[in-house]
A protein has these predicted regions:
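C-terminal accessory segments enriched in acidic
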Residues: 29-37, 46-311
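Short acidic-aromatic active-site loops that bind/stabilize oxyanions
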Residues: 43
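Active-site microenvironments of hydrolase-like enzyme catalytic domains
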Residues: 1-35
Length: 311
């Protein structure tokens, strides 16, 4: 039987190292082999190797390593392999900023496994204190793609100050060769214990609903005659188009495309809604959130293709 085993998993990108804004890019676990989470020699050796792996990985992704929950699950593969006598090391691959295909995380997996093989081959892991394993922070699910802090939102005649958490969700195209985004409001309110891959300090900024451009476009060619950035600065977020190309899964400009038959619902900011609205300060529109992506309207906008199509 193998003395050591590695159990590799993909993990949500929304895990963070507990109490920090850093993603849990890699999470380790020496799985429990019983409900009591006892530590025998087999599990202890897995812990020692993980401590060494973490010490190496901190050089490449400082603060971005977490410790996965060790609650016992009798149906889990890793828990059973540990129980059967192989020192099992779970490696979870989470998120890394600007790495949607997890290419950087693949490198960190390589470094992790190579460092483990080294310490096992040399036997140096035997001298490691397992108390160091407990110092690796737990991973926690408190991370979102975009966090807007301290915004003012008017509702039923009252003004409220709140944070807005947004996740940019991938939707596979047919054939699974590419994807587009359909973002959602993940949470609202006091989110001081949550973090964002991108964070906007919004004190003094108000949430402003987007307007529908009054002229209906005949087809996609009409977009060439529009200054879409100026339309955004003027508060327009939706364009009606009579003939929307069938192959379009998302808009080619930073405004949502709407068919004549589609009625846009009055603006409400709720959990689960598509996050699309403007931010304004001192009676001036300064930013726009389009399908969960924040754009600064004082800067040039190019190659933005993440707006929605409502047929």
């Amino acid at each position: 039987d193998a003395e050591f085993g590695f159990n590799l998993h993909d993990q949500s990108t929304y895990y963070n190292a507990e109490l920090t804004p850093k993603p849990a890019t890699i999470s380790y676990l020496a799985p429990a082999y019983n409900y009591e989470k006892e530590i025998n020699d087999v599990r202890a050796d897995a812990m020692r190797v993980i401590v060494f792996m973490n010490s190496i990985l901190q050089k490449y992704a400082p603060g971005q390593v977490g410790r996965y929950n060790d609650s016992f699950e009798p149906r889990a593969f890793g828990d059973n392999i540990q129980k059967w006598g192989t020192s099992t090391i779970l490696i979870e691959s989470g998120g890394y900023l600007d790495d949607p295909e997890k290419q950087e995380i693949r490198k960190l997996n390589y470094v992790s496994i190579l460092s483990a093989i080294y310490t096992i081959a040399t036997g140096k892991y035997k001298d490691i204190d397992i108390a160091e394993y407990e110092k690796i922070p737990h991973n926690d699910r408190k991370l979102v793609d975009l966090k807007l802090e301290g915004l003012t939102y008017d509702l039923h005649g009252n003004s409220y100050t709140m944070d807005v958490a947004i996740n940019q969700l991938e939707v596979d195209e047919e054939g699974n060769n590419d994807f587009w985004y359909s973002s959602r409001v993940y949470d609202l309110g006091d989110l001081s214990t949550s973090y964002g891959y991108e964070t906007f300090r919004g004190e003094g900024y108000s949430i402003i609903p987007g307007k529908i451009y009054p002229e209906e476009l005949a087809d996609a060619s009409a977009l060439e005659n529009l200054d879409t950035v100026q339309l955004l600065r003027d508060g327009y977020l939706y364009l009606r188009m009579k003939d929307i190309p069938e192959e379009w899964v998302c808009s080619t400009v930073p405004l949502h495309i709407v068919s004549p038959a589609n009625e846009i619902e009055p603006f409400d900011l709720w959990v689960g809604e598509n996050p699309s609205f403007f931010l304004g300060k001192d009676d001036q529109i300064t930013h726009v959130v389009v399908n969960g992506f924040l754009l600064d309207l004082s800067k040039e906008i190019s190659d933005f293709t993440n707006a929605m199509i409502y047929r």
